[in-house]
Design a protein with these regions (language model features):
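Short glycine/threonine-rich turn/loop motifs
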Residues: 1-50, 125-256
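Extracellular low-complexity, Gly/Ser/Thr-rich intrinsically disordered linkers
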Residues: 218-308
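Short amphipathic alpha-helical segments, especially helix-boundary/capping motifs
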Residues: 59-62, 122-123, 193, 213-217, ...
Length: 308
């Protein structure tokens, strides 16, 4: 597979790994108060699910529509059985397809998508972890060791919190933004046709202090969503854990090759894309054994829905 997704135009790729829509309904609104957190997309630029849903339709590397009217026009001629256009007009009308209604209908469409993404189809909580929490299952010794490391020496829970708080379910994220020192992904450069620097939150806020920071993702169903990180630079959960464990221990890869170096993730790590704002306070030299890395991966796989 590729580290980023191809849109409707063959050969045209996005520049970030697609985040999951599952459990996105629990992401709080984007806020600057009390520490920057929340919002949709990797950089938080959409305040909520409806705002996020309005983006891909007009993105030239995703759905490649040029106007809101073009999108609503496609809904009007939709061939879905049962008369989708009639249903849309009932929900978003009156006169949802009239030219003067385009903006209202476009927003209504996005709110409908957001409502769908808020249903239990997108937040079933049917993982082994949930079954253990409910007393209906038990972890294996390896999985339990992984959880103990996750909340202890591996320091994963420092950001991927295991306490939902306020009656919220456990989502394994603080919804904040971090720069963990990831390298650029030159495979993405090959797909999009040009090198670039992804400023993340700093680009959205036009604030150099936030350059290279991306929203901390939840870990529900994380075993189903490789590759990993905002640019897909890490190919497996094992490689993710190994990066956190050895980022500051392994030597740097050949700078001419970056993550294309054959030793990437094994004998070296490529240099961070944006080192100036990198968080080096609690990761990079965790001194975990190979077996302990495997245990953390085993625990994270218990977060997959339908595994019980």
């Amino acid at each position: 597979g590729t580290p980023v997704s191809q849109g409707v135009v063959p050969g045209r790729f996005g520049n970030r790994h697609s985040p999951s829509a599952a459990y996105a309904v629990f992401t709080p609104l984007f806020t600057l108060k009390g520490g920057i957190q929340g919002g949709q997309f990797w950089d938080g630029r959409a305040s909520d699910l409806a705002a996020q849903a309005r983006g891909p339709f007009l993105n030239p590397v995703e759905m490649n529509n040029t106007t809101r009217g073009q999108v609503i026009g496609k809904i009007q001629i939709s061939p879905f059985e049962g008369g989708y256009a009639v249903l849309f007009d009932q929900v978003c009308g009156p006169n949802a397809f009239a030219p003067e209604s385009v903006d209202r209908s476009y927003v209504c469409m996005s709110e409908a998508i957001a409502a769908f993404e808020g249903t239990t189809l997108f937040r079933p909580f049917t993982s082994k972890f949930d079954a253990v929490q409910a007393g209906r299952a038990s972890f294996t010794a390896q999985e339990q060791n992984g959880l103990d490391l996750f909340t202890g020496n591996a320091k994963c829970a420092h950001c991927h919190t295991v306490n939902g708080g306020g009656g919220q379910p456990v989502l394994f994220t603080d919804f904040k933004f971090h720069n963990i020192g990831l390298p650029e992904n030159r495979r993405v450069f090959q797909l999009v046709g040009t090198p670039f620097t992804d400023l993340g939150l700093g680009g959205f806020l036009n604030d150099p202090r936030q350059n290279g920071k991306f929203k901390n993702p939840h870990l529900r169903n994380v075993g189903l969503t490789p590759p990993f990180m905002h640019n897909g630079v890490l190919s497996s959960l094992k490689q993710v854990v190994h990066f956190y464990n050895t980022r500051d221990v392994l030597p740097k890869c050949d700078p001419a090759l970056g993550n294309l170096d054959p030793g990437f993730g094994v004998t070296c790590w490529a240099a961070p894309e944006i080192p100036g704002t990198m968080d080096s306070s609690f990761l990079g030299d965790l001194r975990l054994t190979d077996a302990e890395e495997d245990a953390i991966v085993a625990f994270m796989l218990t977060l997959t829905d339908g595994s019980m």
